[in-house]
């Protein structure tokens, strides 16, 4: 069960957490060149994706409550992280601190570092992610964790 009163920081995954994909086809090549070209050219690489209004309510609540929020997505290069950060700002209207990492496994590592750097207890940080393994790693290390669906249900039940 989420304890938002205790949360001082929310860390958001990107793909299928903040940015819901509807195109599930594989990249055309092993380097995902089409996506990279769009990112480099400043085109909307997520044109088929949608935001979620319940998640937006929680993000705006966190802003109003003075809670920190960060983006913790697994990326392969800086331009991907910046592109995701900009997409969130454009669609949710919230600027997230960028804590993107090189792998899913490193999400726990950056969460531990964030807790130490900012003086937070582990249970004062909430990870919202669609991958069960990430949620499990976070919870096993004392962090709060929730899937996007849990957040949506929480907002619909307790917010408006």
Task: Give the positions of each predicted feature.
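Active-site neighborhood of HAD-like aspartate-dependent phosphohydrolases
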Residues: 1-50, 154
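Conserved Lys-Pro-Asp/Glu-containing loop-to-beta segment of HAD-superfamily phosphomonoesterases
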Residues: 107-133
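Short glycine/proline-centered loop/turn elements that form peptide/ligand docking sites
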Residues: 26-29, 111, 131-137, 147-158
């Amino acid at each position: 069960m989420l304890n938002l009163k205790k949360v001082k920081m929310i860390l958001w995954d990107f793909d299928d957490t903040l940015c819901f994909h509807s195109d599930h086809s594989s990249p055309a090549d092993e380097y995902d060149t089409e996506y990279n070209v769009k990112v480099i050219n400043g085109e909307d690489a997520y044109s088929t994706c949608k935001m979620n209004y319940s998640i937006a309510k929680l993000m705006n609540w966190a802003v109003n409550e003075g809670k920190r929020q960060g983006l913790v997505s697994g990326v392969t290069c800086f331009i991907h992280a910046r592109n995701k950060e900009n997409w969130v700002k454009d669609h949710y209207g919230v600027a997230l601190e960028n804590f993107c990492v090189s792998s899913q496994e490193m999400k726990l590592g950056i969460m531990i570092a964030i807790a130490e750097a900012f003086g937070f207890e582990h249970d004062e940080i909430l990870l919202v992610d669609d991958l069960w393994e990430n949620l499990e790693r976070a919870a096993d290390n004392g962090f709060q964790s929730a899937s996007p669906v849990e957040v949506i249900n929480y907002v619909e039940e307790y917010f408006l």
